[in-house]
Amino acid sequence: MVRVYFINNNVFKRMKNHMNHKEYLGKELNIVIDRELGSKHPEYGFIYPVNYGYVPGTISGDGEELDCYLLGVFEPVKTFKGKCIAVVHRINDDDDKLIIVAENKEYSDDAINALIEFQERYFEHVIVR
């Protein structure tokens, strides 16, 4: 029996974006932090337990710049240069996130999930390495 799967353009675009995001793994990136550690989300009111920002000049599946969580920096920062160690691929959303860390820092998948749970608990996701 042969199974044929049809993928509509939207799903293909999401898969393609996800594959492109894997290009960042292991690379050093300059990021801009627009939601500093301890700041309050303007719409939903939760507090950011980590610095959260984006990679300038990129585009994610939601049409905005590619978002990222900055782990291991325990003070609010405006910009940062760090290494991408993982991609948070949202299965039920178009908005993947990068995991950025300071040099020589490593986090297990369990540790990453614990640190990003404040926001990712609303989405099905996998950690891609």
Question: What spans do the regions from the language model cover?
Answer:
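N-terminal amphipathic/basic-hydrophobic helices that include classical n-h-c signal peptides
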Residues: M1-M15
